[in-house]
């Protein structure tokens, strides 16, 4: 990633090792799999402040999406150059939103949503999608599904993702006046057309 230095900017675990991420990359030519790593949020804030003025000079963005900021757990970083407790990790992520919304005047959001980010985020992507979507038998990044028609393979997704007897939009009930929420990008309204009307409710 531009703006980051490896391995200096990676979160260090208590034993000094790099914190491995969740999206390993496999080289299609060699078959070798390379792990991904989690960047320390302190370094993320630094790089955000470095990049945004240049980005805004090139394109007049009015909104910005912070990938993973509210989708991952709070971490501890044991690197003496950028140490973090879980509390300071949360505070650093809040500063990223503050920078974008209060200093730059942008609309800013992230994935999944956390209550600690509600005061500083404008929207959360994916809050409306339930775990039944993420647990479906088709890889969630594959678009489109093999079929867009009703399919027994998606019975759990339909039952727990849409059935009003089971689905309680608790996050929206609590924070609906504070921020917007959306379906996950791969679980959008046109993913399964026969369910559009339920997603519009």
Which residues are covered by each model-predicted region?
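Active-site-proximal substrate-binding groove within the catalytic cores of carbohydrate-active enzymes
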Residues: 30, 38-64, 68-201
């Amino acid at each position: 990633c531009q703006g980051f230095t490896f391995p200096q900017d990676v979160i260090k675990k208590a034993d000094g090792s790099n914190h491995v991420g969740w999206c390993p990359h496999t080289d299609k030519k060699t078959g070798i799999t390379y792990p991904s790593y989690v960047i320390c949020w302190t370094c993320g804030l630094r790089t955000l402040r470095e990049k945004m003025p240049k980005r805004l000079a090139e394109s007049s963005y009015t909104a910005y999406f912070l990938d993973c900021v509210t989708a991952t757990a709070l971490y501890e970083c044991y690197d003496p150059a950028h140490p973090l407790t879980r509390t300071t990790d949360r505070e650093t992520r809040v500063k990223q939103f503050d920078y974008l919304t209060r200093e730059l005047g942008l609309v800013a959001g992230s994935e999944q949503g956390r209550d600690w980010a509600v005061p500083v985020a404008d929207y959360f992507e994916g809050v409306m999608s339930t775990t039944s979507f993420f647990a479906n038998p088709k890889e969630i990044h594959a678009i489109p599904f093999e079929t867009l028609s009703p399919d027994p393979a998606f019975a759990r997704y339909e039952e727990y993702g849409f059935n009003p007897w089971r689905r309680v939009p608790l996050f929206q009930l609590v924070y609906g006046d504070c921020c917007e929420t959306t379906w996950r990008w791969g679980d959008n309204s046109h993913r399964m057309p026969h369910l559009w009307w339920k997603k519009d409710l």
